[in-house]
Amino acid sequence: MKVKKLVVVSMLSSIAFVLMLLNFPFPGLPDYLKIDFSDVPAIIAILIYGPLAGIAVEAIKNVLQYIIQGSMAGVPVGQVANFIAGTLFILPTAFLFKKLNSAKGLAVSLLLGTAAMTILMSILNYVLILPAYTWFLHSPALSDSALKTAVVAGILPFNMIKGIVITVVFSLIFIKLKPWIEQQRSAHIH
């Protein structure tokens, strides 16, 4: 069973990496903020195997992305930010879906994940991530007002939109995937 779990998590990580490459900017937001659907395989991993599997998918896709594409900052600041955002987004599903085992429960848990990702990534970008980018890029530090503007006009709406879009997309495909996910989960438990 451990081999099967390893294979499934590896396959989901590979799919997540490919989905990460198929990103697109959202109109009206800064071009460096791109939406992708790479959190979908991590949600599937969580529903089948639990939180550690979902976190593993988030980690592996970002490591692969850094190895293959690198980072404009030279260090994986963006990948770390993506890992944190993805983990914040998917973790409520790991804990709430077990209690609310339904499509409605899934939507509620993903919307809570959207709220967690939006709020905490806004704070982390203000305090840590955006200052790290400027430091590693050897750019002048952003003023307090520039940081606030970047977060309020870019980061906050981006994470909210991304979470809502992924929630809607996953909720729609969940209807078709639910029997397969339940079959995989019951095979994992037994």
Swiss-Prot record:
UniProt entry keywords in alphabetical sequence: Cell membrane, Membrane, Transmembrane, Transmembrane helix, Transport
Disruption phenotype: Abolishes riboflavin uptake, cell growth less inhibited by roseoflavin.
GO cellular component annotations of the record: plasma membrane
Alphabetical list of InterPro entries matching this protein: ECF_trnsprt_substrate-spec (IPR024529), RibU (IPR025720)
Induction / repression: Induced by riboflavin deficiency.
Activity regulation statement: Inhibited by excess of riboflavin or FMN. Also inhibited by protonophores such as CCCP and FCCP or in the absence of glucose.
Topology of this chain in the membrane: Multi-pass membrane protein
Residue spans, topological domain Extracellular: 1-5, 61-76, 131-154
Subcellular location: Cell membrane
Gene3D superfamilies with a match to the protein in the record: 1.10.1760.20
GO molecular function, one term: riboflavin transmembrane transporter activity
Superkingdom of origin: Bacteria
Side Cytoplasmic, residues: 27-39, 98-109, 176-190
GO biological process, one term: riboflavin transport
Transmembrane segments: 6-26, 40-60, 77-97, 110-130, 155-175
Family stated for the protein in its record: Belongs to the prokaryotic riboflavin transporter (P-RFT) (TC 2.A.87) family.
Subunit structure: Forms a stable energy-coupling factor (ECF) transporter complex composed of a membrane-embedded substrate-binding protein (S component), 2 ATP-binding proteins (A component) and 2 transmembrane proteins (T component). May be able to interact with more than 1 S component at a time.
Reported function: Mediates uptake of riboflavin and roseoflavin, a toxic riboflavin analog; may also transport FMN. Probably a riboflavin-binding protein that interacts with the energy-coupling factor (ECF) ABC-transporter complex. Unlike classic ABC transporters this ECF transporter provides the energy necessary to transport a number of different substrates. The substrates themselves are bound by transmembrane, not extracytoplasmic soluble proteins.
Record-given protein name: Riboflavin transporter FmnP
Organism placement in taxonomy: Bacteria, Bacillati, Bacillota, Bacilli, Bacillales
